[in-house]
Each structure stands twice: as structure tokens, then as C-alpha cells.
Curated annotation (Swiss-Prot):
The protein's name: Thymidylate synthase
Gene: thyA
Residues reported to bind dUMP: 25, 123-124, 163-166, 174, 204-206
Biological classification of the source: Bacteria, Bacillati, Bacillota, Clostridia, Eubacteriales
Binding site for (6R)-5,10-methylene-5,6,7,8-tetrahydrofolate: 166, 262
UniProt keyword annotation of RNA-binding present: no
Protein family according to the UniProt entry: Belongs to the thymidylate synthase family. Bacterial-type ThyA subfamily.
Coiled-coil intervals, chain numbering: none
Pathway: Pyrimidine metabolism; dTTP biosynthesis
Root EC class: transferase
Subunit structure and binding partners: Homodimer.
Enzyme Commission number(s) from the entry: 2.1.1.45
Subcellular location: Cytoplasm
Recorded GO CC terms: cytosol
Swiss-Prot/TrEMBL catalytic activity: dUMP + (6R)-5,10-methylene-5,6,7,8-tetrahydrofolate = 7,8-dihydrofolate + dTMP
Length: 263
């Protein structure tokens, strides 16, 4: 069994059994637990679910859209057959002053790469998407809003802080795509991938996702081993990565589980 299936499903079960039944801004009630944490050694295993199919290529495209393209254009994603931001697209075809727009405005990727190469013991290395003056000019506040970076013994470690974690849909995407980001940055800075810690402040399951999570829990004992992540070893510039340079090898998984997104 993959370590991610084990940790993810344990928290899913805990939320279903012990979560607080709560209202929220979407109007769809949730079962929620605060302060859930998962940690992975990326040298040993790539974290992705096998107890259901995760659209890895879509997750990679979104990741590159945010951090490489530094874009807020939903139409750019649509041109790649990615529709996960359609519900939040504004009249101008963007998501306003959020995600990639914030990365670009504050030159956050270039500053991080420079620090990783030239001052790896810096304790101030982070990417912060929670920029208060720009929150209200976007249709959705960033969910995954902070990454903190550390280099120890030649290994790149990352902590991802997520204010709100949709356990059925968002969290599996976010864990895998930010684990990819660690690998990409490690490769272009001459480091090895190390620890990846995913902290979710509000971990929740929407009531219309309960049956889907219960179905997934029945597959726990039939989970597969984690796949291997392949990254094109020829790429040394972060901005040269394309989705074709990032692949999973031997990704065995169960069938998809349809769940509704709450807007």
C-alpha cells in the first residue's frame, strides 16, 4: 500500500467518525476537523492516491500554470483542456489577483530559486500567496497559500500550509502537485527532494461526498504501491518544464470516484 493512501484514508475515516458537522460559505454542510498533518519522505515515495484515480496530468498543468507561467488566465487552462477553474472565472477570463498573478507580482519563484542556490541556509525562504491588499479582487481566496522551504544535508524540504482542504477533491490534487514542485525545484537547484509536510488548517468532507469517501475506504486493503515520478533529467531551467517532462511510471489505481465541487 502507498503511504499516502494509508495516511489520507486514516484522516478521512477520522473526519467521518469524529468530525464536526458545520455550515460554511458554500451552503453545503461539511464534516470537519482542524489541524490535520501528513508528512512524506520524497526520496522514498511519491504521494498520490491509488484507491482512486487522480488526474495527475491535470494537476501538473495547474501547477505549471501557477508557478511557471505565473498566469491568472482561466482561458489558458481551458486551452489545455483543464476546466477546474471554470466556476470561478471572472468576466475578463481570469481569476483576478490570485495564485499565479501574486507569484509574478512579487517575483516569488525567482527569489526562491536564487536563495536555494546562493543562500540555502536562509530561514526566510517561502512563497506566500496570502497578500491582503489583493485578496478581495479575486473570486476565491487561495487555499494552498504558503510554502516554507528548508535545505538540510543537501535535501530540499517543504512545508505546505493550506487554510481549507476539500478532502474529497482538492487535497489529493494539492498533495501530489506540490510534491512535484519540490522535485522540480530540487532538480534545477542541484538538491535532492527531502521531506514534504502538508498542513491543512480546516480539513473537511462535504456531505455530498460522504458516500464517495466511504466507497474509497472499502478499497484500503486493496491499495497499490506508489508509482515512480519521472522528470526529464535534461531540464535545468525551471521555466523550461512542460507537462511532457513530468510523468508517473507504473501508476496503478482503482477507478475514479465522482464527487461534486462546492463553489
Amino acid at each position: 500500500m502507498s503511504l499516502y493512501d494509508d495516511k489520507y484514508l486514516a484522516i478521512a475515516n477520522d473526519i467521518l467518525e469524529n468530525g464536526y458537522f458545520d455550515n460554511n460559505r458554500t451552503g453545503v454542510k461539511t464534516y470537519k476537523l482542524p489541524h490535520q498533518i501528513m508528512q512524506f519522505n520524497l526520496e522514498k515515495e511519491f504521494p498520490i492516491l491509488t484507491t482512486k484515480f487522480v488526474a495527475f496530468k491535470t494537476a501538473v498543468k495547474e501547477l505549471l500554470w501557477i508557478f511557471k507561467d505565473q498566469s491568472n488566465s482561466v482561458k489558458e487552462l481551458q486551452s489545455q483542456n483543464v476546466k477546474i477553474w471554470d466556476e470561478w472565472m471572472m468576466e475578463d477570463g481570469t481569476i483576478g489577483t490570485s495564485y499565479g498573478w501574486i507569484v509574478k507580482k512579487f517575483d516569488q519563484i525567482d527569489k526562491l530559486i536564487d536563495a536555494l542556490k546562493n543562500n540555502p541556509q536562509d530561514r526566510r525562504m517561502m512563497i506566500n500567496l496570502w497578500q491582503i491588499p489583493y485578496l478581495d479582487s479575486a473570486p476565491l481566496y487561495p487555499c494552498c497559500f504558503l510554502t516554507m522551504w528548508d535545505v538540510t544535508d543537501g535535501k530540499l524540504n517543504c512545508m505546505l500550509v493550506q487554510r481549507s482542504g476539500d478532502w474529497g477533491l482538492g487535497v489529493p490534487f494539492n498533495t501530489s502537485q506540490y510534491a512535484v514542485l519540490v522535485h522540480l525545484l530540487a532538480q534545477v537547484t542541484g538538491l535532492k527532494p527531502g521531506l514534504f509536510t502538508h498542513v491543512i488548517n480546516n480539513a473537511h468532507i462535504y456531505e455530498n461526498q460522504v458516500d464517495g469517501l466511504k466507497l474509497q475506504l472499502t478499497r484500503k486493503n486493496d491499495a497499490y504501491n506508489a508509482p515512480k515520478l519521472w522528470i526529464n533529467p535534461e531540464i535545468t531551467n525551471f521555466y523550461d518544464f512542460t507537462p511532457d517532462d513530468i510523468k508517473l511510471e507504473d501508476y496503478k489505481h482503482h477507478e475514479s470516484i465522482k464527487m461534486d465541487v462546492s463553489v
